[in-house]
Amino acid sequence: MQNSFDVIVVGGGHAGTEAAAAAARLGVRTLLLTQNLDTIGQMSCNPAIGGIGKGHLVKEVDALGGIMALAIDQAGIQFRTLNASKGPAVRATRAQADRSLYKRAVRRLLEDIPALQLFQGMVGDLLMEGDRLGGVILETGLVLRAAQVVLTTGTFLGGRVHMGDQNYPAGRAGDPPSNALAQRLREMAFPVARLKTGTPPRIDGRSIDYGVLEAQPGDAPPPAFSFMTRRIGVPQLACHITHTNARTHEIIQTNLHQSAMYGGHIQSVGPRYCPSIEDKVVRFADKASHQVFLEPEGLDTHEVYPNGISTSLPFGVQIELVRSMRGLENAVLLRPGYAIEYDYLDPRELHPSLESRRLPGLFCAGQINGTTGYEEAAAQGLLAGLNAARRARELAAWTPGRHEAYLGVMVDDLVTRGLDEPYRMFTSRAEYRLQLREDNADLRLTPHGRALGLVDDQRWTAFSAKQDAVQAERNRLEGLRIHPGSAIAGRIAAKTDQPLSRDVTALELLRRPDWDYASLLQVLDLVPCSDAQACEQLEIECKYAGYVARQHDEITRAARWEGTDIPADMDYAAVRGLSTEVMQRLARQRPQTIGLASRIPGVTPAAVSLLLIHVKRRGLRQAG
């Protein structure tokens, strides 16, 4: 094995696999290091991909040539569109995964990339050559060299598992933590803090009484994640729903002192939007019950994931609380639930490229940046891997803007605002979510991906064909003019109770709220275009055209100062009128642009105006 690479990625989870794939797609020599090759792409917690905000990220990763969407399409055993009754901007795809199929799909996709090499080993230290990053040192002493290193350590960095009053070092149950690297980062004065997350016990599905439970089937046909997938070929399964009850809550309340969290064994903050069952019972004491989704873990296993009861209670209490729920009276538990604490680095120490400000060449992605979720990790991994490869080629970093992608929103939030709890993506975090939809992720990002070298010929050809189909259908509908008094106008009046008063095109009708694409074509007696994705995109574009145009105007106005560079040597004390607090915040984070400065907590609009004036005056003085 060679020991010199352009990019080394540490960690084989969802961030690491995307980082390695992105870097290698650019053709640079890339090494993916993981402590166990058999766990590459492993789903450590829930067997699912997507959801509100998260599905948008998966589509964006796919639009940029990533692997997550392709892998879940090859492994998904139930697909659903969430918020299907709401507007397209907040609709999101979610899929249950067969864990084994997903892991195999990820491994296969990675092994198909020529410039990527996999290796099993635990990183114990960063190789420093003076004050420059030179690679990594494995715990075996093996030295691997690269000027660019991407850390995607997940929950392994100083990880410690908790169950009741018992705890032990682990990256997840059954896998050792990365303690030597965690200690090294602390010694190097990186800003390290602790977060926690958790997972529920697993149940033997043969011990569940499904006959008394509500079934939750997937959509038919299943909605694929990848823009490259035309059909889901994996057999589909239903999930089931049960609920906690008064007895469940009594068991939890009685044993709360034994919980690792409430017993004082864990001080770290967990994810607000994925609380443990103990948290739910305490924080929402007025609720009589909570939903629990029983999710199959695969086609060839009886193991079931009870989504909604993450816990750090002792195992005996876990058995009792599970068996208190309808349909689970005789449940057999296969694995205990637990909480896990781990180290993360303050993401405000990163550039928007996800490169460290403290140590050039070091990139971070995933839970090491304080985020939670496979999808958030994958999106960061792709960006970090891309920019590590671009740095290796001495090219400028690339990061999408907040108006271009949820990835841009997330990274901007992380590097400007930081966090005090695990960060999860929601559509509500985006100012311009009307144009950040799942359906147009390819339109927004695939041209960027092509220019950056992430998108191959096959994907580019498919994207171009789809856009040609959208334009052809737009032209067809725009060219179909309907006259008042015609037979078609009569059918339209019969449907809407409103006769036409002037000539209209079919495209104008599609823009109206009382028409959808299918019913319009039925009235006009037209066959739909052959590309279903193209039909959907055209319809949504028509419906949102006015709103998107207004948002585009907002973006254009903001862009006048958003991208204005702030000199790296800016003396904030010289900016007249800034408060001491604002001055200190700006000096600590040293934002690269006015836009980034405007989103730092505590930096007021008035302060932004003063800063903008100062930067412009400084530029004029230097020019003169």
Curated annotation (Swiss-Prot):
Keyword Chaperone attached: no
Pfam families listed in its UniProt record: GIDA, GIDA_C_1st, SAM_GIDA_C
Predominant subcellular localization, coarse grouping: cytoplasm
SMART domains documented for this protein: GIDA_assoc_3
Subcellular location: Cytoplasm
Binding positions (NAD(+)): 270-284
Transmembrane regions listed in the UniProt entry: none
Residues that, per the record, bind FAD: G11, G12, G13, H14, A15, G16, V123, S178, Q367
GO biological processes: tRNA methylation; tRNA wobble uridine modification
Oligomeric form and interacting partners: Homodimer. Heterotetramer of two MnmE and two MnmG subunits.
Cross-referenced PANTHER family: GLUCOSE INHIBITED DIVISION PROTEIN A, PROTEIN MTO1 HOMOLOG, MITOCHONDRIAL
Entry similarity comment: Belongs to the MnmG family.
Name this polypeptide is given: tRNA uridine 5-carboxymethylaminomethyl modification enzyme MnmG
UniProt source species: Acidithiobacillus ferrooxidans (strain ATCC 23270 / DSM 14882 / CIP 104768 / NCIMB 8455)
